Amino acid sequence: DGKELPPIKGGQLRQWEVRYSCPQWIIRSLQQSYGEQATIDFLEYSLERPPLYARVNTARGSVEACVKCLQEEGVRVQIDPDLPGCIALEQTASIERLSAFQEGLLHIQDKSSQLCAAALGAKPGERVLDCCAAPGSKSFTAAEWMGDEGEIVSCDIFAEKIKKIKQGAKRLGLSCIRARLQDATAFDPSLGQFDRVLCDAPCSGIGIIGRKP
Protein backbone atom coordinates (compact mmCIF):
# COMPACT_ATOMS: atom_id res chain seq x y z
CA ASP A 1 0.00 0.00 0.00
CA GLY A 2 3.04 2.26 -0.21
CA LYS A 3 3.34 2.83 3.55
CA GLU A 4 6.77 2.77 5.15
CA LEU A 5 7.54 0.35 7.95
CA PRO A 6 8.27 1.94 11.33
CA PRO A 7 11.87 1.66 12.56
CA ILE A 8 12.76 -1.93 13.45
CA LYS A 9 15.05 -2.63 16.37
CA GLY A 10 17.78 -5.21 15.92
CA GLY A 11 20.30 -6.23 13.30
CA GLN A 12 19.85 -6.96 9.63
CA LEU A 13 18.40 -10.43 10.15
CA ARG A 14 15.74 -9.07 12.49
CA GLN A 15 14.88 -6.26 10.05
CA TRP A 16 14.51 -8.69 7.17
CA GLU A 17 12.48 -11.04 9.36
CA VAL A 18 9.91 -8.30 9.95
CA ARG A 19 10.02 -6.74 6.49
CA TYR A 20 9.59 -10.03 4.63
CA SER A 21 7.61 -11.99 7.27
CA CYS A 22 10.21 -14.73 7.13
CA PRO A 23 11.92 -16.54 10.04
CA GLN A 24 15.56 -15.72 10.64
CA TRP A 25 16.66 -19.34 10.27
CA ILE A 26 15.34 -19.45 6.71
CA ILE A 27 17.00 -16.13 5.86
CA ARG A 28 20.29 -17.32 7.33
CA SER A 29 20.12 -20.57 5.38
CA LEU A 30 19.40 -18.73 2.13
CA GLN A 31 22.31 -16.36 2.70
CA GLN A 32 24.70 -19.22 3.31
CA SER A 33 23.55 -21.07 0.20
CA TYR A 34 22.96 -18.27 -2.31
CA GLY A 35 24.46 -15.02 -1.04
CA GLU A 36 22.90 -11.73 -0.02
CA GLN A 37 21.49 -10.43 -3.31
CA ALA A 38 19.85 -13.71 -4.28
CA THR A 39 18.35 -13.89 -0.78
CA ILE A 40 16.86 -10.41 -1.14
CA ASP A 41 15.45 -11.29 -4.57
CA PHE A 42 13.92 -14.46 -3.16
CA LEU A 43 12.35 -12.67 -0.20
CA GLU A 44 10.96 -9.89 -2.40
CA TYR A 45 9.43 -12.44 -4.76
CA SER A 46 7.91 -14.39 -1.86
CA LEU A 47 5.70 -11.38 -1.05
CA GLU A 48 4.26 -11.17 -4.56
CA ARG A 49 1.05 -12.89 -5.54
CA PRO A 50 2.19 -16.08 -7.27
CA PRO A 51 0.77 -17.03 -10.67
CA LEU A 52 -1.57 -20.01 -10.92
CA TYR A 53 0.09 -22.71 -13.00
CA ALA A 54 -1.43 -25.80 -14.57
CA ARG A 55 -0.07 -28.73 -16.49
CA VAL A 56 -1.84 -29.72 -19.71
CA ASN A 57 -2.71 -33.42 -19.87
CA THR A 58 -0.84 -34.15 -23.09
CA ALA A 59 -1.87 -37.81 -22.86
CA ARG A 60 -5.43 -36.67 -23.57
CA GLY A 61 -5.01 -33.68 -25.89
CA SER A 62 -2.81 -30.88 -27.16
CA VAL A 63 -1.81 -27.69 -25.38
CA GLU A 64 -3.61 -25.71 -28.06
CA ALA A 65 -6.88 -27.60 -27.56
CA CYS A 66 -6.73 -27.10 -23.80
CA VAL A 67 -5.97 -23.40 -24.15
CA LYS A 68 -8.86 -22.98 -26.59
CA CYS A 69 -11.24 -24.71 -24.16
CA LEU A 70 -10.14 -22.42 -21.34
CA GLN A 71 -10.41 -19.29 -23.45
CA GLU A 72 -13.93 -20.23 -24.50
CA GLU A 73 -14.84 -20.15 -20.80
CA GLY A 74 -13.33 -16.70 -20.39
CA VAL A 75 -10.03 -17.72 -18.77
CA ARG A 76 -6.92 -15.81 -19.79
CA VAL A 77 -4.05 -18.19 -20.46
CA GLN A 78 -0.33 -17.80 -21.08
CA ILE A 79 1.71 -20.68 -22.46
CA ASP A 80 5.02 -20.97 -20.62
CA PRO A 81 7.87 -20.49 -23.11
CA ASP A 82 10.34 -22.63 -21.15
CA LEU A 83 8.45 -25.73 -20.04
CA PRO A 84 6.35 -27.83 -22.45
CA GLY A 85 2.79 -28.36 -21.27
CA CYS A 86 2.98 -25.64 -18.61
CA ILE A 87 0.41 -22.83 -18.70
CA ALA A 88 -0.34 -19.89 -16.41
CA LEU A 89 -3.97 -19.02 -15.66
CA GLU A 90 -5.58 -15.90 -14.31
CA GLN A 91 -6.43 -16.36 -10.64
CA THR A 92 -9.87 -17.86 -10.28
CA ALA A 93 -11.66 -19.51 -7.38
CA SER A 94 -13.66 -21.94 -9.52
CA ILE A 95 -11.09 -24.07 -11.36
CA GLU A 96 -13.03 -27.26 -10.56
CA ARG A 97 -16.06 -25.90 -12.43
CA LEU A 98 -14.20 -25.40 -15.70
CA SER A 99 -14.89 -27.89 -18.49
CA ALA A 100 -11.17 -28.28 -19.13
CA PHE A 101 -10.70 -29.42 -15.53
CA GLN A 102 -13.75 -31.69 -15.41
CA GLU A 103 -12.79 -33.33 -18.71
CA GLY A 104 -9.28 -34.04 -17.45
CA LEU A 105 -7.49 -31.75 -19.88
CA LEU A 106 -5.29 -30.32 -17.11
CA HIS A 107 -4.35 -30.45 -13.47
CA ILE A 108 -3.20 -27.65 -11.20
CA GLN A 109 0.53 -27.86 -10.52
CA ASP A 110 3.12 -25.24 -9.68
CA LYS A 111 5.91 -24.72 -12.18
CA SER A 112 8.60 -25.84 -9.73
CA SER A 113 6.78 -29.14 -9.28
CA GLN A 114 6.44 -29.56 -13.04
CA LEU A 115 10.18 -29.00 -13.39
CA CYS A 116 10.81 -31.87 -10.96
CA ALA A 117 8.77 -34.21 -13.13
CA ALA A 118 10.48 -32.96 -16.28
CA ALA A 119 13.93 -33.48 -14.74
CA LEU A 120 12.97 -37.08 -13.98
CA GLY A 121 13.01 -37.73 -17.72
CA ALA A 122 10.66 -40.72 -17.58
CA LYS A 123 10.11 -42.43 -20.93
CA PRO A 124 7.23 -44.52 -22.29
CA GLY A 125 7.31 -48.10 -21.04
CA GLU A 126 9.48 -47.43 -18.00
CA ARG A 127 8.73 -48.32 -14.40
CA VAL A 128 8.84 -45.33 -12.04
CA LEU A 129 8.60 -44.97 -8.26
CA ASP A 130 7.23 -41.73 -6.79
CA CYS A 131 8.17 -42.05 -3.12
CA CYS A 132 6.14 -39.20 -1.59
CA ALA A 133 3.49 -38.79 -4.23
CA ALA A 134 0.47 -37.06 -2.67
CA PRO A 135 -1.47 -35.25 -3.94
CA GLY A 136 -0.18 -36.85 -7.14
CA SER A 137 0.66 -33.95 -9.43
CA LYS A 138 4.24 -35.08 -10.15
CA SER A 139 3.04 -38.63 -10.82
CA PHE A 140 0.41 -37.25 -13.20
CA THR A 141 2.94 -35.15 -15.09
CA ALA A 142 5.43 -38.02 -15.28
CA ALA A 143 2.66 -40.24 -16.66
CA GLU A 144 1.89 -37.63 -19.30
CA TRP A 145 5.58 -37.42 -20.27
CA MET A 146 5.43 -41.22 -20.64
CA GLY A 147 2.34 -41.08 -22.83
CA ASP A 148 0.55 -43.14 -20.15
CA GLU A 149 2.70 -46.14 -21.15
CA GLY A 150 4.56 -48.06 -18.46
CA GLU A 151 3.93 -48.01 -14.72
CA ILE A 152 4.20 -45.40 -11.97
CA VAL A 153 3.97 -46.62 -8.39
CA SER A 154 2.80 -43.60 -6.38
CA CYS A 155 3.36 -44.04 -2.64
CA ASP A 156 2.22 -42.19 0.44
CA ILE A 157 1.73 -43.04 4.11
CA PHE A 158 -1.81 -41.68 4.44
CA ALA A 159 -4.82 -43.59 3.09
CA GLU A 160 -6.81 -40.41 2.47
CA LYS A 161 -4.03 -39.04 0.27
CA ILE A 162 -3.83 -42.30 -1.67
CA LYS A 163 -7.55 -41.88 -2.36
CA LYS A 164 -6.89 -38.41 -3.80
CA ILE A 165 -4.16 -39.74 -6.09
CA LYS A 166 -6.56 -42.38 -7.42
CA GLN A 167 -9.29 -39.78 -7.96
CA GLY A 168 -6.92 -37.47 -9.81
CA ALA A 169 -5.59 -40.24 -12.04
CA LYS A 170 -9.15 -41.32 -12.88
CA ARG A 171 -10.19 -37.77 -13.79
CA LEU A 172 -7.15 -37.40 -16.05
CA GLY A 173 -7.65 -40.84 -17.59
CA LEU A 174 -4.16 -42.00 -16.61
CA SER A 175 -4.14 -45.78 -16.33
CA CYS A 176 -0.42 -46.33 -15.66
CA ILE A 177 -0.53 -44.96 -12.10
CA ARG A 178 -0.69 -47.43 -9.21
CA ALA A 179 -1.38 -45.58 -5.95
CA ARG A 180 -0.04 -47.53 -2.99
CA LEU A 181 -0.08 -47.07 0.78
CA GLN A 182 3.63 -47.34 1.46
CA ASP A 183 6.29 -45.88 3.75
CA ALA A 184 9.20 -44.99 1.48
CA THR A 185 11.62 -45.16 4.41
CA ALA A 186 10.91 -48.89 4.89
CA PHE A 187 12.51 -51.25 2.38
CA ASP A 188 9.95 -53.47 0.66
CA PRO A 189 11.39 -56.03 -1.79
CA SER A 190 7.92 -56.70 -3.19
CA LEU A 191 8.10 -53.37 -4.98
CA GLY A 192 10.67 -54.78 -7.38
CA GLN A 193 13.04 -52.72 -9.50
CA PHE A 194 12.48 -49.34 -11.11
CA ASP A 195 14.00 -47.45 -14.01
CA ARG A 196 13.64 -44.13 -12.21
CA VAL A 197 12.83 -42.93 -8.70
CA LEU A 198 11.35 -39.54 -7.81
CA CYS A 199 11.65 -38.32 -4.23
CA ASP A 200 10.61 -34.73 -3.61
CA ALA A 201 9.93 -35.25 0.09
CA PRO A 202 9.62 -31.54 1.04
CA CYS A 203 7.49 -30.90 -2.07
CA SER A 204 9.89 -28.31 -3.48
CA GLY A 205 10.42 -27.04 0.09
CA ILE A 206 11.12 -23.40 0.82
CA GLY A 207 10.69 -22.61 -2.87
CA ILE A 208 6.90 -22.52 -2.39
CA ILE A 209 6.93 -20.19 0.62
CA GLY A 210 5.10 -17.52 -1.38
CA ARG A 211 2.22 -19.93 -1.95
CA LYS A 212 2.26 -21.55 1.50
CA PRO A 213 3.67 -18.98 3.97
Task: Map each language-model feature to its residues.
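S-adenosylmethionine
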Residues: 1-213
